[in-house]
Design a protein with these regions (language model features):
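Conserved acidic carboxylate
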Residues: 7
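Alpha-helical interaction/dimerization surfaces of two-component signaling modules
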Residues: 15, 19-26
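Helix N-cap/capping motif at the beta->alpha junctions
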Residues: 35-41, 64
Length: 96
């Protein structure tokens, strides 16, 4: 399984990556996890190969909702999981 994490906070990205890797080890899954530090880097480097994208919403340069809308144009079937601590963004995520 290919997983992308788009998260500007290095500590949060590491925690999520560690959780994914522990899950993969526990259930004998092969997971390749790529971490992107912002939405611009992600859109520039992404090769439409992820099964799941964990997307932070509040990021510099371009927020995760805008990045996800761009992603949908090139990869309409990828699963996007929004990660945020800001309740006001929860409903807006369903639009993407």
């Amino acid at each position: 399984m290919n997983i992308a994490i788009v998260e500007d906070c290095a500590e949060d990205a590491k925690v999520l990556k560690d959780c994914i890797e522990k899950y993969a080890e526990k259930y004998n899954e092969v997971c390749v996890v790529n971490v992107y530090t912002d939405g611009v880097q992600f859109l520039t480097e992404y090769k439409s190969d992820a099964d799941v994208v964990f997307m932070d919403i509040e990021m510099p340069y371009r927020d995760g909702l805008k990045v996800s809308a761009e992603l949908r144009k090139t990869d309409p079937l990828v699963c996007i999981v929004f990660i945020t601590n800001m309740r006001q963004y929860a409903i807006r995520g369903y639009d993407v």
